[in-house]
Amino acid sequence: MSTHFVDRVVVHASGGDGGNGCASVHREKFKPLGGPDGGNGGKGGDVILEVDPQVTTLLDLQRRPHRSAPDGRFGMGSHRNGADGDDLVIGVPDGTIVRSASGELLADLVGPGTRYVAAPGGRGGLGNAALASAKRKAPGFALLGEPGEVLDLHLEVKTLADVALVGFPSAGKSSLVAALSAARPKIADYPFTTLVPNLGVVEAGSTRYTVADVPGLIPGASEGRGLGLDFLRHVERCVALVHVLDGANLETDRDPVSDLEAIEKELAAYRVDDGAVPLQDRPRIIVINKADVPDARDMAEIVRADLEEQGAPVFVVSAVAHTGLRELSFAMAELVSAARAAEPEAVPTRIVLSPRAVDDQGFKVTREEYGDQENRQVRFRVRGEKPRRWVRQTDFTNDEAVGYLADRLARLGVEDELFKAGATPGAEVVIGDDANAVVFDWEPTMHAGAEVLGQRGSDLRLEDHSRPTRDEKRLQERERRAAKVTARDELEAERRAGHWTAADEADEELSQR
C-alpha cells in the first residue's frame, strides 16, 4: 500500500446525455386520426462520489480518470418513455475534498455513505405527445435530450484523525503508532520509511480516538521540501498535535529543543483553509522517544525543563520497551475529549418538503459591438438558463421545432427585450455564451395561427413572405396585361387560319359574353 497511496487526482467526469423525445403518430385500423403518441426520452445518469470505508486511496481514479455515466434511452411510439441512464457511483476515501478546476470548494465528504453529485445527467426531451396542445394537436417534432454536465474535478484526501504525530524522520512515530494501537506500519532504521499517513485506533479508558503517523518533516517543509507539502495537509483535520522528538539522535547539530523549534516554524508557516484553526494554535503534547537508550534518558533530563517552557506537557516514552505509553495515551484522550466537548451539538435537520425550482426564470439581453474600428458590427446576446436550455433541446433540422422555439422565446419576453435593446428585423442575435451558442438573424414572430395552418414538420413563418414593392406590383400588372393581349392575338390568328371548328367558335362567343 505504501507504494500505491494516492491522495490527489484530477477526474474528468461526464454526466449521461438525456434521451431524445419521439415524434410519432398513433396508427391503428379504423382510427385515421390517432393523434401523437411519441414518448419522452430518459434522463442521463449522474456521476456520484460516495464515501466508501473500504477505499483508502485514489489510486483507481488515477488509473482511470475519465468517468462517464450512461446516456438515457430515446423515447418510442405508443407512449413509451425511454429508460433513465444508470448512475455511476465512484467510491472515495473518507475525508475527500472536491474542488472545481478554478479551486472552488464543492464538497467535503466526511462520513460513510456521504454522497455528492459531481456531474448531473441531462434531462430527457419531451415527445410530441407531451407537446400537443389545443393549437398544436399533432406536433411533427420532439425535443432533444439535454447533454450531461462535463467538468474536471480536483479530488484531495485529508486524513481523518484526532491526533497527529509530527516530527523529524526516524523519530519513531511509526513505532509509536504500532505500540499504541493495532496498526502495523512499515518500520525500518532509515529516514523517510513512512511515505503515507498511517492510522491507528487507540482506546484510553472510555475514550476511543484515532492517531495519524504523518511522514517525517524537515526544515522547509511548508515550502515543499521533502514530503512536507504533500502530507502537511493531513494534519489539518487533527484536533491535537504530538511532537515526537528523537532523544537518541547522534547528529551533532541537532537536539530535541532545536528539532521542536524547527517543526513549530514549519507548522506556523503552513496556511490552513479559511475558518480552520492554525496548526500552531492547536493543543499539543511533547514526547521524547527512545527512552530505552541510555543516551536518550540523559538527554531527556537535560532538555526537559526547556521543553516544558513551551507550555505543553512533556512525556518520556519508549515505543520499543512500551514505557510511558499509558500516561501518554490518557493525556491524548483528555485533549480529544476536550475538543469533542467544545464542538457545538449538531442540530437535527428539519425536513421541509417544498417545490424545487427547475431553473432560473430570468434572462438578460445585452448589446455587443465587435470587429475593428473600420468595420464595427453590432449583435445582441441573450443570456439565461431557460433560453439556453431551450436552444439545446431544439432540432434545427425541423422547421416546426424552430417555430416552437420562437414561440417560447416570445412568450418569455425575449422579443420585447430585444426591441428595447434596439434590435431591428434582421439583426444578429446570439443565445448563450459558450461553445454551444446559437447565432441567427432575428425576425419578429408572427402569431396569426401559422403553427396551426402549416403541415407537420413545417412552419409557414419560416417561408419567404416578402411583400412586393409598388414598382414590382406595377411591373407584374403590365406583364399580366401583355400576356393576356398576346394570348388573344394567338387565338385570333388560329381562328382566321381556319383551325377552329364550329364548337370552338361557340365556346369563344360564350366566353366573350
From Swiss-Prot:
The gene is obg. Its cofactor is Mg(2+). InterPro entries: G_OBG, GTP-bd, GTP-bd_Obg/CgtA, GTP-bd_prot_GTP1/OBG_C_sf, GTP1-OBG_CS, GTP1_OBG_dom, GTP1_OBG_dom_sf, OBG_GTPase. PANTHER family: DEVELOPMENTALLY REGULATED GTP-BINDING PROTEIN-RELATED, MITOCHONDRIAL RIBOSOME-ASSOCIATED GTPASE 2. One of its GO terms (molecular function) is magnesium ion binding. It comes from Kineococcus radiotolerans (strain ATCC BAA-149 / DSM 14245 / SRS30216). The keyword Transmembrane helix does not apply. Residues 355-444 form the OCT domain. Transmembrane segments: none annotated. Keywords: Cytoplasm, GTP-binding, Hydrolase, Magnesium, Metal-binding, Nucleotide-binding. One of its GO terms (biological process) is ribosome biogenesis. Coiled coil: none annotated. Residues 458-497 have a biased composition (Basic and acidic residues). GO terms for cellular component: cytoplasm. Residues 3-160 form the Obg domain. Monomer. An essential GTPase which binds GTP, GDP and possibly (p)ppGpp with moderate affinity, with high nucleotide exchange rates and a fairly low GTP hydrolysis rate. Plays a role in control of the cell cycle, stress response, ribosome biogenesis and in those bacteria that undergo differentiation, in morphogenesis control. Mg(2+) binds at residues 174, 194. GTP binds at residues 167-174, 192-196, 213-216, 289-292, 318-320. Its EC number is 3.6.5.-. Disulfide bonds: none annotated. It is found in: Cytoplasm. This is GTPase Obg. Pfam families: DUF1967, GTP1_OBG, MMR_HSR1.
